[in-house]
Swiss-Prot record:
Entry's free-text remark on domains: Possesses an unusual extended V-shaped dimeric structure with each monomer consisting of three distinct domains arranged along a curved 'spinal' alpha-helix. The N-terminal catalytic domain specifically recognizes the glutamate moiety of the substrate. The second domain is the NADPH-binding domain, and the third C-terminal domain is responsible for dimerization.
Keywords (A to Z) from UniProt: NADP, Oxidoreductase, Porphyrin biosynthesis
Other information: During catalysis, the active site Cys acts as a nucleophile attacking the alpha-carbonyl group of tRNA-bound glutamate with the formation of a thioester intermediate between enzyme and glutamate, and the concomitant release of tRNA(Glu). The thioester intermediate is finally reduced by direct hydride transfer from NADPH, to form the product GSA.
Coiled-coil residue windows: none
Name listed for the protein in its UniProt record: Glutamyl-tRNA reductase
Species in which this protein is naturally found: Geobacter sp. (strain M21)
């Protein structure tokens, strides 16, 4: 049985394409059942996020299974296959396993190390389990992916460094103030950077967030999203004394906060420190503000330096994570191979043993005056011969480094000797520890 992956991501398709094939999380039953109803597809999990849509499936027919899933994606979403296909990737065997382990470990994410993707895959697996589209192989496969992701998080520092300007700003604020839960943040601007910063500040425990923007409606919208307080831009100078941390990212062509403003602001704050983060280009805050006592100003260049350093560190940690993924691939394939190899070996030995015993019985029954103990010796002899004959094929089957050749060997033996192989059981899953 083969694991296959068919999908697209931010690396292969623009958002205009990704949104065409996205699956609604609350409506997963229908597409999951449709995939497992495809010929030769036995199990399926659908992962659909803002950055990727992927289908994980099991099949004996790799090429056919991939083609059917591609056609399903096109037909289900009413998108021409010729348009979709140039954005799709497909993997099977070890490549499929490596891909999913890397995705779960956030090695394939837009921001390497981000934690959201693991939770999204767990949610997707939950739907597959609920609607019974996953079975023994994908159940084990996804649990192994979760285990790999946990190892990566535990054994590397891949998620510990800021790799976006907005996140770097929050990390810098933490270094300056320590605990941020009792601090008030003022966001000047309502664009993507301010939105990201709002998310990060709230994630680290900030409860007081204010938002101002030249267009008040945009400030209101962002404030509503994060349970913050919208402020009219005209009230900026009256609002500044209430803020401990000010992050500014507007499109203004000139400074909106000047050195001369700070004397009155600090007096009203009783000279408590203020932390300014100016990530606008051109800059929003007069650089001379940094010369004012108790005012600390950082620009986008300061933060980019932090990000660049952390990106280099994250590359080192990513290499460690890739090594963990490679280790775990071997363990998973050892278990996967055993699902079909072990029953086949048992069936092969049973088949040969039945022939041996039948021929031994015929020989013994027609042998008059058989010496005492001879039957026992003949039984041992024929059993030894059988073991010698089966040793080499059994050893080859038990090897775990053969990739898809094991499937060929298993199918060949089953067909050549007309073997009756028992079904795969849940007990096999216990052969591989987390």
């Amino acid at each position: 049985m083969n694991i296959i992956v068919v999908g697209l991501s931010h690396k292969t398709a623009a958002v205009e394409i990704r949104e065409k094939v996205a699956f609604a999380p609350t409506q997963m039953e229908k597409p999951l059942q449709a995939v497992v109803a495809l010929p030769d597809i036995t199990e399926a999990v659908i992962v659909s996020t803002c950055n990727r849509v992927e289908i994980y499936a099991t099949t004996r027919d790799v090429a056919g299974g991939m083609a059917r899933i591609k056609r399903f994606l096109a037909d289900y979403h009413n998108v021409p296959l010729e348009l979709l296909e140039k954005h799709l990737y497909s993997y099977h065997g070890e490549d499929a396993t490596r891909h999913v382990f890397r995705v779960a470990s956030s090695l394939d994410s837009m921001v390497v190390g981000e934690p959201q993707i693991l939770g999204q895959i767990k949610t997707s697996y939950g739907y597959a389990a609920e609607y019974k589209s996953s079975g023994i192989i994908l159940n084990r496969f996804l649990h192994k992916a979760f285990s790999v992701a946990k190892r990566v998080r535990t054994e590397t520092k891949i998620a510990s460094s800021a790799v976006s300007v907005a996140f770097a700003a929050v990390e810098l604020a933490k270094k300056i103030f320590g605990e941020l839960s009792d601090k008030t943040v003022l966001l000047i601007g309502a664009g993507e950077m301010c939105e990201l910063a709002a998310k990060h500040f709230i994630n680290v425990g900030v409860r007081g967030v204010m938002v101002t923007n030249r267009t008040y409606e945009r400030a209101e919208k962002l404030a509503e999203e994060f349970d913050a307080k919208p402020v009219h831009f005209e009230a900026l100078m009256e609002t500044l004394p209430k803020a401990d941390i000010i992050l500014s990212s507007t499109g203004a062509p000139h400074f909106i906060i000047h050195e001369k403003d700070m004397e009155d602001v600090l007096r009203r704050r009783k000279h408590k420190p203020m932390f300014f983060i100016d990530i606008a280009v051109p800059r929003d805050i007069d650089p001379k503000v940094n010369d004012v006592e108790n005012c600390y100003l950082y620009t986008v260049d300061d933060l980019n330096g932090v990000v660049a350093t952390n990106l280099e560190q994250r590359k080192v940690e990513a290499a460690k994570a890739e090594a963990i993924v490679e280790q775990e691939i071997g363990q998973f394939f050892k278990w996967l191979s055993s699902l079909e190899v072990t029953p086949t070996i048992v069936a092969l030995r049973t088949h040969f043993d039945e022939i041996r015993k039948a021929e031994l019985s015929k020989t013994v029954s027609g042998w008059k005056d058989l010496p005492p103990g001879a039957e026992k010796k003949l039984d041992a002899l024929t059993n030894a011969i059988m073991n010698k004959l089966l040793h080499q094929p059994t050893s080859v089957l038990k090897r775990t480094d053969q990739g898809n050749r094991n499937d060929l060997y298993v199918d060949a033996l089953r067909n050549l000797f007309d073997l009756e192989v028992g079904g795969e059981t849940q007990d096999n899953m216990m052969d591989l520890e987390d």
